[in-house]
């Protein structure tokens, strides 16, 4: 971090230092822009504690009729995959209504196509991006393996897998013998699997964010460890207000994830952004290493071998930004994981909770703010911020340069809920 007085004019301010903001900052610095990142703790929010997946197959929307049918059962169990905190339910009703509208068949198809348009190239995008940023050593392309113990669970997952195949995702159905050979530590009751060989994962998301920040600073980028509390359009730029003063930026990229809603509204974008609270349990001495990232179809969570242990990550808790964490949701992951991997050492777990920025349709917001082309919005990536960071950075760079993007970004318009 370096000093930056209030009189200093900023060319491009990046509001938010998660993986999306850092990727945008690095790519813009590569393109010759002078960038300043504003974030009190870069790389230590949702980008730090996620499962690390780079998942080109994330093209099956969460909002489906099957999800809606399962909601009553899930909501009756405080430790189910999806939970709504009762105190937050009244505020969530408009979001849930939009979620239900997104579950209609024609919307599921459209949303799936939109996700595929930006997710399918994510591994290739990361390969080039990571090489430039010097973080290639943190990425492993070892695939993603969905595993199921019950035939009815496997059957219930088939519509999502069929949609992935329809979009062009490479999937291989595998049997119990294949599973036992590939993952010998897997419990024998897991008899069914689907392998996505093209997927990748990050072995240390926090270190990857640090690497992007260092690469940006090596290109002249700067960091202010401050939260932006307000923004205001002025004739010659966008005014950023913080607890320690204000700065004028010629242009800004709003990429502060779950904290973007109010700032976006100040730029004319009124979007139903809310928060999916996600949990992880980190096992420092698991006693085993996985040959691929696993997704347990029974417990609906991911298991990722990382540099500092095994990470169990998942669950969705709708409860906003202010309610206290319920770490029983992280602790239950240990029970699920022991059933999946009987030899797993559960000693000394560390628990974490973070905020996924989520729109009801499952699509991020990427595009110019309605009130000004001085502001580009890039937030709401939910479960796939890590996956989509380089692609998002490429789109943002194109927008600020006035170039025609190779991606159709209309589905991600900040005005789509207007």
Regions found by a protein language model. Give the residues of each.
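Beta1/beta-strand and adjacent pyrophosphate-binding region of the FAD-binding site
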Residues: 6-18
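N-terminal Rossmann-fold NAD(P) dinucleotide-binding loop
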Residues: 21-22
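Glycine-rich FAD pyrophosphate-binding loop
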Residues: 30-49
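Active-site substrate-recognition segment that forms the wall
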Residues: 40, 52-53, 58-102, 230-238, ...
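Rossmann-like flavin
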Residues: 93-214
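C-terminal catalytic lobe of FAD-dependent flavoproteins
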Residues: 171, 205, 298, 339-418
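A conserved short coil-to-beta-strand element within the FAD-binding core of flavoproteins
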Residues: 174-182, 224-238
């Amino acid at each position: 971090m370096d000093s930056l007085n209030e009189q200093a004019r900023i060319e491009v301010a990046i509001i938010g230092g998660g993986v999306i903001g850092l990727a945008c900052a690095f790519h813009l610095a590569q393109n010759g822009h002078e960038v300043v990142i504003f974030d009190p703790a870069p790389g230590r929010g949702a980008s730090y504690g996620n499962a690390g997946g780079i998942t080109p197959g994330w093209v099956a929307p969460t909002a489906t009729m099957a999800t809606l049918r399962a909601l009553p059962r899930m909501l009756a169990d405080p430790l189910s995959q999806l939970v709504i905190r009762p105190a937050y339910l009244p505020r969530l009703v408009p979001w849930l209504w939009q979620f239900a509208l997104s579950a209609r068949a024609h919307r599921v198809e459209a949303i799936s196509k939109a996700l595929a348009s930006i997710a399918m190239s994510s591994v290739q995008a990361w390969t080039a991006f990571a090489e430039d940023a010097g973080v290639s050593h943190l990425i492993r392309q070892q695939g993603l393996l969905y595993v199921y113990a019950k035939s009815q669970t496997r059957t219930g997952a088939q519509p999502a897998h069929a949609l992935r195949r329809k979009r062009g995702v490479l999937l291989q159905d595998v049997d119990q013998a294949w599973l036992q050979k590939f993952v010998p530590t897997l419990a024998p009751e897991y008899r069914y699997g689907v392998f996505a060989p093209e997927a990748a994962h990050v072995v240390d998301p926090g270190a990857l964010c640090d690497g992007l920040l260092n690469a940006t600073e090596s290109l002249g980028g700067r960091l202010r460890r401050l939260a932006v509390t307000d923004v205001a359009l002025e004739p010659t730029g966008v005014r950023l207000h913080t607890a320690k003063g204000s700065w004028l930026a010629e242009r800004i990229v709003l990429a502060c994830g779950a904290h973007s809603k109010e700032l976006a509204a100040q730029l004319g974008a009124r979007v139903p952004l809310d928060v999916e609270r996600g949990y992880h349990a980190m096992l420092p001495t698991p006693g085993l290493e996985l040959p691929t990232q696993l997704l347990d179809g029974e417990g609906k969570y991911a298991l990722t071998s990382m540099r500092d242990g095994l990470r169990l990550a998942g669950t969705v808790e709708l409860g906003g930004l202010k309610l206290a964490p319920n770490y029983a949701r992280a602790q239950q992951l240990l029970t699920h994981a022991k059933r999946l991997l009987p030899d797993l050492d559960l000693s000394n777990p560390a628990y974490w909770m973070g905020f996924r920025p989520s729109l009801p349709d499952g699509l991020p917001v990427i595009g110019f703010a309605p009130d000004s082309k001085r502001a580009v919005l890039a937030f709401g990536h939910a479960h796939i911020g890590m996956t989509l960071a380089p692609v998002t950075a490429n789109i943002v760079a194109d927008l600020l340069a006035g170039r025609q993007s190779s991606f159709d970004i209309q589905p991600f318009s900040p005005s789509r809920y207007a």
